[in-house]
A protein has these predicted regions:
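Catalytic cores of TIM-barrel enzymes
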Residues: 1-327
Length: 327
């Protein structure tokens, strides 16, 4: 079974020949991996990664416009001010050059399932607003935020459609809502402000037959039902170290969702505790013998992780998923 086929089997709730594997390793460890393995690409080939996380696309706002607004507001941009400037054109062709080249390599040459980083609604606007101000604006400027979010949602939809046109397999919406023990804001706020604007992109992607995933760090248990309603098929990372429960997922959500995650960068990998690392990898792989899970890091592996530990982890994962697939 090819990597892309394997991932699709899992997302469609069928049992694959083995659990797909992936890892977010490039961002903090590119130099170290290149020294140890030759390149990140060689590392990905060595462990036969089944997916590729692709980045790129046109900018959403001109930095000059944001800087001017910030200067005018004394270092602060409020929602009404942001509405004074336009988003950039999501159809600008050169913005997709990197997506095309990465897709050619990973999908066409390596046979991997490719997913593209796509803006959500809350996280992407923490850039212009600042996260502390943004959280305050949820209470102060709901009317204005509806319009800011509507514009963002329409931009996101166009970007997602363009990526599907290029041959991207899955639209991966990144939108951090979770804190260590729950949401950063009340679930009712999520339902009023976040949900309807995610729905714009989600509906369009599902109508096209594209696959759909969402990333949120932290604990998003309170809105899992809403994530299902939106049509998301994959959730990353389902963070156990923030209090989320994979047993609860298996009992209540496994018929609707697939988890991509398992290797926790906050508590497990990068701390030199190989016995704990081994136990956790064995536990996670053992929980999902019949599908429903894509093994991945919960976020970017941090730069305090040694190459010896990284190799230990992925040697073990590589071996375990193949042993499991033979049963």
């Amino acid at each position: 079974m090819l990597s892309r086929e394997r991932v699709i089997e899992v997302i469609q709730h069928r049992k694959p020949d083995r659990m797909p594997i992936y890892g977010w390793v490039r961002a903090n460890l590119e130099k170290q991996i290149a020294e140890a393995f030759g390149s990140v690409e060689a590392f990905e080939d060595r462990y036969e990664f089944d997916l590729a996380h692709i980045f790129g696309g046109p900018p959403q706002y001109r930095q000059e416009d944001l800087s001017a607004l910030s200067a005018r507001g004394g270092g602060t941009i409020e929602p009404a001010a942001l509405l004074e400037i336009s988003l950039q054109d999501p159809n600008e062709p050169s913005g997709y050059d990197n997506i095309r080249s990465q897709m050619e390599y990973h999908k066409n040459q390596r046979g991997r399932f490719v997913y593209v980083q796509t803006p959500g609604i809350f996280e992407c606007l923490n850039g212009p607003f600042g996260i502390q101000n943004h959280l305050m604006y949820l209470a102060l400027y709901e009317k204005e935020l509806h319009e800011v979010y509507r514009r963002q949602a329409e931009w996101n939809r166009t970007f997602a459609m363009n990526c599907l046109d290029l041959g991207i397999d899955m639209i991966h919406v990144s939108d951090d809502w979770g804190a260590q023990f729950g949401l950063m804001f009340h679930p009712d706020v999520w339902r009023r402000l976040i949900y309807p604007h995610h729905k714009i992109t989600c509906d369009a992607v599902r109508q096209r037959g594209g696959f759909l995933s969402v990333h949120s760090d932290g604990n998003v248990t309170q809105v899992l039902d809403g994530i299902v309603e939106l049509g998301y098929q994959v959730v990353h990372p389902f963070q156990e170290s923030a209090g989320m429960d994979l047993q609860d997922f298996k009992q209540h959500y496994m018929k609707s969702l697939v988890v991509m995650g398992g290797l926790d960068v906050q508590t497990t990998i990068g701390f030199g505790k190989l016995d704990r690392l081994k136990r956790e990898i064995e536990r996670i792989v053992g929980m999902f013998p019949d599908g429903g899970f894509i093994f991945c890091t919960t976020h970017f592996v941090q730069d305090h992780c040694t190459m010896e530990e990284l190799k230990f982890a992925f040697d073990l994962v590589y071996e375990l998923v193949r042993e499991q697939g033979k049963k």
